[in-house]
């Protein structure tokens, strides 16, 4: 089979298409998926530059999520599932033509949804659901601020929060504001403007994938009883090679921004969210991907795909994501 391989740490050009052995027959409880689209996430970028500690050793195939067709099943899985269109969490290995995954980590792909849209669901929508509902305890009428609102998780959060009756504000560059408004954002905010945060809030929930200096500001925008869900560190992106020296200021800014005593006094909650860690602990994505079945079938979850990029052009997919040019999901297609 063909796969996109991180051959060494560095810029997008280190991504190469390589022939690799097909996976073995699916084990008990597994299915084999012929991949039609694979999601690209910021964690993949961090793995490529050497700043993602959970990434497999090089040369490696990353990719957390795919959509495709089941072509074989292991013992204990209904043989009738062969031929089923599914989306799936892959726990690495998604940038490939074939993957084996646990059957519990798959969800039927609605006929109305393309494979490219399906590949936008397993990471982005489970993260958004966990942040808003699983841990954020979102209630109707609450005010939510979504950083990086035009990204994959950002758009998923907008859709799920609006469906729950929340008022949603989102940060993005000005060129993306019209699209965010069409997606339902009540107020689009230009984060590049000096003092953009002044006069905003207080918010019940802030979703922060930026980290670094953004962490403290997000905390300051919460009302008492508010919840900050931190699920990313895109501020670590400093060039195309691993540099702890360049990343250190952002890491230190997060430490300076947090004090348990202050959070207790202000009655504010900080929630760290790492879907891979939850997945490892539970052994399945089902607690988070399962509740999305209804949202997928009724159109509440309607993934937006910015670009579907062939495997051979994988460096361009990573470049788009790193440059923050996308509104919605970037996916790879074999």
Language model feature labels by segment:
Residues 85, 143, 167, 226-227, ...:
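Short glycine-centered segments of the SAM/dcSAM-binding site in methyltransferase folds
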Residues 81, 121, 125-193:
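Mid-domain Rossmann-like dinucleotide-binding core that forms the NAD(H)/NADP(H) cofactor-binding site
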Residues 198-205:
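A short acidic, Gly/Pro-enriched loop at the edge of an enzyme's catalytic core
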Residues 47, 67-91:
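A glycine-/small-residue-rich N-terminal strand-loop-strand element
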Residues 214-298:
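Glycine-rich phosphate-binding loop and adjacent beta-alpha segment
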Residues 10-13, 20-67:
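N-terminal glycine-rich beta->alpha transition that marks the start or flank
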Residues 90-103:
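A structural motif shared across PLP-dependent enzymes of the aminotransferase-like
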Residues 279-334:
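C-terminal hydrophobic helical "lid"/dimerization subdomain
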């Amino acid at each position: 089979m063909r796969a996109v391989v991180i051959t060494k740490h560095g810029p997008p050009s280190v991504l190469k298409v390589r022939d690799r052995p097909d996976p073995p027959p699916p084990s008990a409880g597994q299915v084999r998926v012929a991949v039609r689209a694979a999601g690209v996430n910021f964690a993949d970028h961090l793995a490529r530059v050497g700043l993602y500690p959970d990434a497999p050793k090089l040369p490696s195939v990353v990719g957390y999520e795919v959509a495709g067709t089941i072509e074989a099943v292991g013992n204990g899985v209904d043989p009738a599932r062969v031929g089923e269109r599914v989306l799936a969490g892959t726990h690495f290995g998604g940038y490939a033509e074939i993957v084996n995954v646990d059957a519990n980590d798959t969800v039927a792909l609605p006929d109305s949804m393309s494979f490219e849209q399906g590949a936008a669901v397993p990471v982005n929508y489970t993260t958004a659901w966990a942040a808003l509902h699983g841990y954020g305890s979102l209630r109707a009428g609450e005010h939510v601020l979504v950083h990086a609102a035009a990204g994959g998780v950002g758009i998923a959060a907008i859709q799920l929060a609006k469906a729950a009756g929340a008022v949603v504000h989102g940060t993005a560059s000005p060129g993306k504001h019209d699209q965010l408004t069409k997606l339902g954002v009540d107020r689009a905010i230009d984060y590049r403007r000096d003092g953009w945060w002044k006069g905003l809030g207080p918010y019940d929930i802030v979703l922060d994938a930026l980290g670094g200096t953004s962490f403290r500001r997000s905390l300051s925008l919460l009302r008492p009883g508010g919840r900050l869900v931190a699920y990313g560190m895109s501020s670590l992106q400093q060039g195309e090679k691993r540099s702890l020296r360049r990343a250190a200021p952002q890491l230190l800014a997060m430490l300076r921004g947090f004090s348990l005593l202050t959070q207790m006094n202000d009655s504010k909650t900080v929630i760290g969210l790492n879907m891979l860690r939850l997945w490892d602990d539970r052994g399945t994505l089902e607690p988070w991907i399962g509740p999305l079945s209804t949202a997928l079938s009724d159109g509440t979850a309607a993934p937006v795909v910015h670009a579907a990029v062939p495997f051979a052009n994988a460096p361009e997919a990573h470049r788009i994501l790193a440059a923050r040019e996308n509104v919605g999901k970037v996916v790879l297609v074999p």
